[in-house]
């Protein structure tokens, strides 16, 4: 999905759903026509299915008839190859400007921009910096907060440039996928974004990458916790933390070096910038152990089971819980 529509376009509003942008969530909630192309309407997108896009007529296009009306009942459906179907639809369209609607969405984009913390090292900062320094890279992710930041802050403009375990959510997926992508695309830069929890699950594959002399980059967003689970425990379970702390002194730099990779630990924006530039110039696997705050959260967010137009950010949450 990411990259199928140019992420640099002024009409691109970002991801939809639990960690989608406020603009996308509000836009879908207010639109009168929703064309869903090759989507499965997962729970992370729908929120509360009974309140999803209630003002819209929904047209679902998919090559697999099993997907039609599976998770939500749509008004119309077309079964077929998307490229052929869209071509046929284009033949039927008449030129329309939709000035008022586009202006309304543009106002939302101004009101609810995706911001990056100016101080300190953070996931959003690193993803935005990676995009600035390596726009044409193939991005790979593990599963968790870092995965959401990689979807939010890297502007994908081409298909098949984000490899991620979306629906299955398999921690440990990324490093092996990055090795495969780098092997298949030796002239491309491949970057795997991992959390420290995910990295532990398949870090032995660094030895494979080193043996094959693959110049992939592994960025560990190291917050010493299972960040996404901890975020839920903070927001919805009264800070009852269970089985999410990983602060046991494991040295990922030494582990990486022992497996033949170059490695750096960074704690500031400046150190990350320098380490990432060094990684881009490396001819072997390069690991960046980036230390971030354990309480960093992915914003915006929709509470599980809530309608997507009830998305909130950190300021909203603090105001509600004063």
Model-derived segments and their meaning:
Residues 211-304:
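Thiamine diphosphate
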Residues 55-143, 269-273, 278, 284-322:
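Phosphate/pyrophosphate-binding active-site segments
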Residues 106-181, 235:
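Active-site diphosphate/adenylate-binding microenvironment
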Residues 1-59, 158-187, 203, 235, ...:
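Glycine-rich, anion-gripping cofactor-binding loops and their flanking helix/strand elements
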Residues 173, 177-215, 221:
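Catalytic phosphate/nucleotide-handling subdomain of diverse soluble enzymes
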Residues 1-6, 43, 65-69, 75, ...:
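Short gly/pro/ser/thr-enriched loop/turn and capping motifs at secondary-structure boundaries
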Residues 74-86, 204-222, 303:
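A short alpha/beta connector and helix-capping loop motif
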Residues 13-20, 69-74, 160-164, 201, ...:
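Short beta-alpha connecting loops at secondary-structure transitions
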């Amino acid at each position: 999905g990411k990259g199928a529509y140019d992420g640099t376009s002024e009409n691109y509003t970002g991801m939809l759903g639990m960690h989608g942008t406020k603009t996308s969530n509000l836009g879908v909630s207010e639109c009168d026509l929703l064309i869903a192309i090759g989507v499965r309407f997962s729970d992370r997108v729908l929120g509360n299915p009974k309140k999803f896009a209630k003002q819209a007529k929904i047209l679902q296009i998919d090559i697999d008839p099993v997907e039609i009306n599976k998770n939500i009942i749509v008004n119309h459906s077309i079964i077929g190859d998307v490229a052929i179907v869209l071509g046929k639809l284009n033949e039927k369209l008449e030129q329309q400007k939709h000035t008022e609607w586009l202006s309304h969405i543009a106002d939302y984009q101004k009101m609810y921009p995706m911001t990056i913390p100016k101080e300190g090292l953070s996931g959003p900062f690193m993803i935005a910096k990676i995009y600035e320094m390596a726009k044409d890279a193939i991005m790979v992710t593990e599963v968790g907060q870092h995965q959401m930041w990689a979807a939010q802050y890297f502007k994908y403009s081409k298909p098949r440039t984000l490899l991620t375990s979306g629906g299955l959510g398999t921690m440990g997926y990324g490093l092996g996928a990055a090795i495969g992508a780098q092997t298949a695309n030796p002239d491309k830069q491949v970057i795997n974004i991992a959390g420290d929890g995910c990295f532990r699950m398949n870090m032995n594959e660094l030895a494979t990458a080193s043996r094959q002399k693959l110049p992939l980059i592994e960025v560990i967003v190291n917050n010493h916790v299972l960040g996404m689970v901890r975020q839920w425990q903070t927001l919805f379970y009264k800070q009852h933390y269970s089985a999410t702390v990983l602060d046991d002194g494991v040295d990922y730099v030494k582990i990486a070096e022992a497996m033949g990779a170059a490695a750096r630990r960074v704690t500031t924006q400046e150190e990350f910038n320098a380490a990432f530039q060094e990684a881009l110039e490396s001819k072997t696997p390069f690991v960046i152990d980036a230390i971030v705050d354990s309480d960093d959260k992915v914003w915006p967010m929709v509470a599980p089971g809530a309608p997507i137009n009830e998305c909130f950010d950190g300021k909203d949450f603090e105001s509600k819980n004063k």
